[in-house]
A protein has these predicted regions:
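N-terminal intrinsically disordered/low-complexity leader segments
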Residues: 1-2, 154-158, 268-269
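C-terminal regulatory/oligomerization modules of transcriptional regulators
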Residues: 142, 270-271
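Basic/polar phosphate-binding segments, predominantly the helix-turn-helix DNA-binding elements
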Residues: 173-176, 181-218, 237-266
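N-terminal regulatory/effector-sensing and dimerization cores
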Residues: 2-104
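Short, Lys/Arg-enriched, Trp-marked, Pro/Gly-tolerant hinge/linker segments that flank
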Residues: 101-117, 121, 125-192, 205-217
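Short helix-to-turn junction characteristic of helix-turn-helix DNA-binding domains
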Residues: 41, 175-179, 226-230
Length: 271
């Protein structure tokens, strides 16, 4: 039976969300998180797409995304795939030390290495409340530190050009400050000193989505933060610039994987 369950993890170096999806058969459109997203595929398979390329994720594959990395996931068949994900913040990962300091990406969003996937899954099961959690944190920390060996320093990646980075930063700051308002592409482009068409090209090249799609995902992440603090779904929708609750629900599922109401219930359950 397909199911998707959120839980919350409290560890000595931070607190963060965790997700287990069983027979997830829905296509994830391109999206990003403002946290790391790290997990393991347990059953089935899917195709992972990022601006770096395309990968096949199978049972035992580790999924690893840096904050802001746009990615899409497509199930390979109607049975879907079963996976676990944990979403540690940048601050939480930096508490682990050297391997996670500075700007970097993982060598690939899909890593096939049993030495990594075994310990990571062994740690995730008790962390998500399915077994004794006495030793879970040490297992998880050891697995994450091992994952640090698969990172690629920023200067070894095909990074966006300096001019593109400046334009994206200006656009991000403008949109992030106006999530409750109507954001128009022409206004953002004018602020950045480029044409709307050029701005779209820059965002596709540097980020992987259009400026408006990027803005919608910023709104979803803000709504998610509001729900985590106990706000009602309708209040979060209004405050984050969605036309109504159903508009938020559609966008929220595309980024988070579950409807906002279910996410809110998971927050209330752990309170």
């Amino acid at each position: 039976m397909p199911s998707t369950e959120f839980s919350h993890i409290e560890l000595s170096f931070g607190s963060f969300d965790a997700l287990r999806a069983v027979h997830f058969a829905r296509r994830f459109p391109p999206h990003f998180h403002d946290t790391f997203a790290i997990g393991v595929v347990e059953e089935g398979s899917c195709v992972i797409r990022t601006r770096r390329g395309e990968w096949m994720a199978r049972p035992g594959s580790v999924l690893a995304f840096s904050p802001g990395e746009v990615h899409a996931a497509i199930p390979c068949d109607e049975q879907g795939y079963t996976y676990r994900m944990i979403y540690p913040s940048v601050e939480a990962m930096q508490e682990l030390g050297g391997a996670f300091r500075g700007v970097f990406a993982f060598c690939a969003p899909v890593i096939d290495d049993e030495r990594l996937s075994g310990p990571l899954r062994e740690a995730q099961v008790p962390l998500m409340g399915e077994g004794a959690a006495v030793y879970a944190e040490s297992l998880f920390v050891a697995a994450l530190r091992q994952l640090g060996g698969f990172r690629v320093p920023a200067d070894r990646r095909a990074e966006r050009a300096a001019a593109d980075a400046r334009i994206v930063a200006i656009a991000h700051e403008h949109m992030a400050a106006r999530l409750s308002d109507s954001v128009k592409l022409d206004d953002v482009a004018a602020l950045c000193g480029v044409s709307p068409f050029h701005l779209i090209r820059i965002f596709h090249r540097a980020v992987g989505v259009t400026p408006i799609a990027y803005c919608i995902q910023l709104r979803v992440l803000r709504a998610q933060a509001m729900l985590a603090e106990g706000s009602a779904v309708a209040d979060a929708a209004y405050a984050c610039g969605f036309s109504d609750q159903s508009h938020l629900t559609r966008a929220f599922r595309d980024v988070v994987g579950v409807p906002p109401g279910r996410y809110l219930r998971s927050v209330q359950h752990r309170a």
